Amino acid sequence: MPRDYYDILGVDEDASDKEIKKAYRKKAMEYHPDRNPDDPEAEQKFKEASEAYEVLSDPEKRQRYDQFGHDGVDSGAGGGRRGRGRGFHDIEDIFDAFSDIFGGAPGGGRGRGRSERGRGRPGSDLRVSLSLTLEEIAEGTEKNLRLQKYLECESCDGTGAEGGMGGQNFSMCPKCDGTGEIRQVSRSVFGQVVNVQPCPRCEGEGRIIDNLCDDCGGEGRVQGEESISINVPPGVMEGNYLTLGDAGNAGLRGGPSGDLRIEIEEEPHEHFERDGLDIYYDLHLSFPEAALGTEVDVPTLEGEARLEVDPGVQAGKILRMRDRGLPDLEGSGQGDQMIRVHVWTPQELTAEEEELLDQLRAHDNFQPRPPEEDTQKSFFRRVSDVFS
């Protein structure tokens, strides 16, 4: 038998949207698969919390659930469900279309029904940059961020009124009679035209505050600092971003919080250049090493590794170290580490060194010649031969 959605989130049946959202965020952070790898029970609880929030955050679905239970929201009842979990994107889903690696507020929770009219105005979104090393990108990492932002005023529970919801500090707006709207009806040759605008007296809230909170001056929010912890999956790249729903600035007088968008930046690396999933490293060899072959230790993202260089390697040759690059964000493969060979030529020689090199220069093996694949006639030369 399916568990009760209110029990899953740990809230009462008369819980407000704000309480439901807060409970869901707590459960999601506690049971998120990134925080509980290889824990099937935590993954199941995360899915249950997500399913419960999808229903209880939607006024229409919640009404059907309250009236008919699970039958009211299961497939085929009351219009059916749109697919489990599709109403939101969590930190894994942000990479689905990855220009959206980090995309979307849970449960479409920014929308509000008519019963929530007057719960303040939404807070603005925040954008921050997160700088990562290639090593962190390769392994995935957990980062702590300290944010300067608007926080909900604790003194008034975000209402802007002294004493919060428990106080008798609100009265119906006399201008709009609590509707939050001003309707103006005019007549034209086409009939009646109704113009609806937010009430300027109560700013569309339908109520006015009689006694303002001293701490926030009636805004329901104060400036402060908040620390958050985020899990960055392996394989992200410059320009990707994470979106954490409801982690932006708190709204005015109980309005929903904005989102937090975390944009990924890659730190320059002392050894490597990135090209997609591959990384490039420049290997400098002396002339004898290139001619005779050698074994060298080269840096990789996992530490030093031994590389064997065959005799006669040419400058510009690309050597490949398989699976030493970066992982694919969606887990479908691993890049390689590419080694660009550079042959170093000495600029100052002793008389003895000049004599040795002069002797070598006379031998046929030291005369430059093109690689085997270049000894064939070019396409244009072969075409020319046909018509000559």
Swiss-Prot record:
UniProt-annotated binding residues for Zn(2+) 1: C153, C156, C213, C216
PROSITE patterns, sorted: DNAJ_1, DNAJ_2, ZF_CR
CXXCXGXG motif repeat copies, ranges: 153-160, 173-180, 199-206, 213-220
Keyword hit for RNA-binding: no
GO biological process, alphabetically ordered: chaperone cofactor-dependent protein refolding; DNA replication; protein refolding; response to heat
Cytoplasm among keywords: yes
Record InterPro entries: DnaJ, DnaJ_C, DnaJ_domain, DnaJ_domain_CS, HSP40/DnaJ_pept-bd, HSP_DnaJ_Cys-rich_dom, HSP_DnaJ_Cys-rich_dom_sf, J_dom_sf
Cofactor field: Zn(2+)
Key words, A-Z: Chaperone, Cytoplasm, DNA replication, Metal-binding, Repeat, Stress response, Zinc, Zinc-finger
Compartment list: Cytoplasm
Region (Disordered), start-end ranges: 27-86, 99-125, 362-388
Comment on bound cofactor: Binds 2 Zn(2+) ions per monomer.
UniProt: Zn(2+) 2 binding residues: C173, C176, C199, C202
Sequence ranges assigned to domain J in this UniProt record: 4-69
Gene3D superfamilies for the chain: DnaJ domain, Heat shock protein DnaJ, cysteine-rich domain, Urease metallochaperone UreE, N-terminal domain
Coiled coil: none
Bias type Basic and acidic residues, positions: 27-50, 58-73, 113-124, 362-376
Domains (record comment): The J domain is necessary and sufficient to stimulate DnaK ATPase activity. Zinc center 1 plays an important role in the autonomous, DnaK-independent chaperone activity of DnaJ. Zinc center 2 is essential for interaction with DnaK and for DnaJ activity.
Function (record text): Participates actively in the response to hyperosmotic and heat shock by preventing the aggregation of stress-denatured proteins and by disaggregating proteins, also in an autonomous, DnaK-independent fashion. Unfolded proteins bind initially to DnaJ; upon interaction with the DnaJ-bound protein, DnaK hydrolyzes its bound ATP, resulting in the formation of a stable complex. GrpE releases ADP from DnaK; ATP binding to DnaK triggers the release of the substrate protein, thus completing the reaction cycle.
Record text on subunit structure and interactions: Homodimer.
Name the UniProt record assigns to this protein: Chaperone protein DnaJ
Source organism of the structure: Salinibacter ruber (strain DSM 13855 / M31)
